Amino acid sequence: MFHLDEIDNIFEAASRSRLFKNREVLLPDYVPLELPHREAEIKRLAEVVAPALRGERPSNAFIYGLTGTGKTAVTKYVLRRLQEMAKARGASVSWLYVNVRQRETPYKVLADMGEQLGLRVPFTGLSIGELFSRVVRRLSRLEGVYIVVLDEIDFLVRRGDDVLYDLTRVNEYLQRARASLIGITNSVKLLDSLDPRVKSSLGEEQLVFSPYNAEQLRDILSQRASAAFNEGALEEGVIPLVAALAAREHGDARRALDVLRVAGEIAEREGAPKVTEDHVRRARLEIERDRATDVIRTLPLHGKLILAAILRASESSPEGRATTGEIYDAYRQLASSLGLEEVTLRRASGVLGELDMLGIISSRVISRGRYGKTRVVELAVSPDTVINALSEDPTLGGVVQGLGRGGRPKGAQ
């Protein structure tokens, strides 16, 4: 039995941490006073939004780059400074921030905007059109410039871009207020997939954020580590290792900071005097497992079913691999066993591409000589992680139980 004094010991140990000074500076939503290696991007975005200080509507902007390249941090950094300067000059400038992925639906996106404007929004009961009208009416009674940031905007586009189109036209309904949009996405191809009307409006200004290299990541990690950890809490090789690992994963600074934080938490739990390279490697595996589980949980049913099909199709392969055709055949069998209508091969291939982008699988095209080329797929995370996450879906419980746990994923330990 777990006794209260054991809980007290855990809390007591945490309160007198020898390692952490302020772990909050390693969290994803923390915006530091300085953003190393993003000076050009800060300058460019500041130029885009500067007209707001004159009461003019800034151009809409579209910001894209891979995960962890500083898009959100730079946007918040610039807009906070803009609002401070506007206040000092007596100008009326405000900004709203909505993470579209966290809000999940167009209704919740509009509701979040409305609430930030002081509007009381019922949880349900309104149509999208009525809610949009209420947000517009609220804005029309206000004055000044409003900059709306839609982070991870691709999650809104996937549900259709009608709301996005309406938002790009919002100034047609305003008299005293002005509004502009900043869309942030990880997908460099998203803008091309939009309705031409939305594309021309939202893409008035475009900013591209390149991945950080290992040296830049070391600078970022060193800056945050000096504020997050007590002096001497990190072994000498910790920051170079975290930077090197993150540089291999597309220069993702957010992931690098997560790994450093979790490595510190593992060391703290174990009562270690310092954070070591071993703590870093274990933190990376722990984060991969937790992230993969969260991603799989949020997949639509057929996405989960295709993932289960990868497990089934790759069971007989010593390398844990399967071709697209083998996976689709396994998917059709699973869909049939559940009485579900199957998606097309083209759609299934699209789902595989999305899973690849999310880091759950990896795929590549190989040559089979006179038989031509084919795409082979393998898991990029542990099969156990996939099976455990899929098992949480009651629809798939019976199917998943019949899957083996063979097939070593690429990079798994």
What positions do the PLM features span?
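A short, basic N-terminal segment
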Residues: 1-58, 412-413
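Mid-core helix/loop region of P-loop NTP-binding domains shared across ATPases and GTPases
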Residues: 2-20, 27, 58, 101-220, ...
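Walker A/P-loop nucleotide-binding motif
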Residues: 56-79
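Conserved catalytic segments around the Walker B and adjacent sensor/switch elements
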Residues: 60-62, 85-101
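Post-Walker A helix-loop "phosphate-sensing" segment adjacent to the P-loop in P-loop NTPases
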Residues: 80-92, 118-122
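AAA+ ATPase "lid" subdomain C-terminal helix
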Residues: 247-253, 261-274, 314-317, 335-336, ...
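Conserved C-terminal helix/linker of AAA+ ATPases
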Residues: 266-289
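Terminal-proximal interaction/regulatory segments of ATP-powered molecular machines
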Residues: 314-413
